[in-house]
Amino acid sequence: MAFLEDANHTAVTEFILLGLTDDPVLKVVLFSIILCIYLVTVSGNLSTILLIRVSSQLHHPMYFFLSHLASVDVGYSSTVTPKMLANFLVERSTISYLGCTIQLFSGAFFGTLECFLLATMAYDRFIAICNPLLYSTKMSTQVCIQLLVGSYIGGFLNASSFLLSFFPLLFCGPNRVNHFFCDLAPLIELSCSGSNVPIVPASFCSAFVIIVTVFVIAISYTYILITILKMRSTEGRQKAFSTCTSHLTAVTLFYGTITFIYVMPKSSFSTDQNKVVSVFYMVVIPMLNPLIYSLRNNEIKGALKRQLARKIFS
């Protein structure tokens, strides 16, 4: 049953996810495409994690954080993709209240964690390029673990703020969520809580996360650019640029899409456009990150070649 009656109102116990389309043919096409993307995402990111773990030459802070970013990408994509694939195969796409809660928390947690990890990786590049003599001290194992734990705590706190905004919501009747997953904005639109909707915790925490992480990334790359421009060696400049290009690409893709969805005025784009961009940053970007970080990284390509050669000739 979708509703439970009590003395005061009708409580929703499940939601209907309207998804991306009602067209049966398009559903089959999207199912095939997104399934392929998800399989590439999982295999690509797990391969990245395994390669970093087994290759001693990749046991550096940058790759330590990259392996955790790959883990986050698997978790982030798995938050919505399996359920979305299952919904393509059924006529009525439903999700329980508990399932919606878990999806909301997981999406906020992994999304926030990705923000913090991207900022941490920018700081790591700043230390490596601008203060190379202090790198082993500034980015020691203890410091890396502290930064990682801080990122996870930040992700948990921001995700908890989403639950603080979600739990007080009252759903008096309509339970059709105009999205393919449980995001806070369409859930608030669906609620009958009126002007008392407690969206302040989620809004404040999310804004804080975005401002802080963007500030760290911007300051880090400003100093990196200044340092690179001061280099006299062309080879040194090219090496420094190649080190940062992949990370900057990942940052631009991720922050560009979340800015489109969460920062731009809602009147400037339609709900369907919102859904398409959401698919890009929750499904496509996790697939692209392993490619972005490996194609332009000679150390990763070299480690992969050595591991393959070892397997072939062993």
From Swiss-Prot:
Gene3D superfamilies (alphabetical): Rhodopsin 7-helix transmembrane proteins
Entry membrane topology: Multi-pass membrane protein
Species annotation: Mus musculus
Short name of one Pfam family: 7tm_4
Protein's job: Potential odorant receptor.
Transmembrane stretches, start-end: 29-49, 58-78, 103-123, 137-157, 200-220, 241-261, 275-295
Disulfide bonds: 100-192
Cytoplasmic side: 50-57, 124-136, 221-240, 296-314
GO molecular function: G protein-coupled receptor activity; olfactory receptor activity
GO cellular component: membrane; plasma membrane
Keywords: Cell membrane, Disulfide bond, G-protein coupled receptor, Glycoprotein, Membrane, Olfaction, Receptor, Sensory transduction, Transducer, Transmembrane, Transmembrane helix
Locations listed in the record: Cell membrane
Chief subcellular location: membrane
Glycosylation sites: 8
Protein's name according to its UniProt entry: Olfactory receptor 5P50
Entry's family note: Belongs to the G-protein coupled receptor 1 family.
InterPro entries: GPCR_Rhodpsn (IPR000276), GPCR_Rhodpsn_7TM (IPR017452), Olfact_rcpt (IPR000725)
Source taxonomy: Eukaryota, Metazoa, Chordata, Craniata, Vertebrata
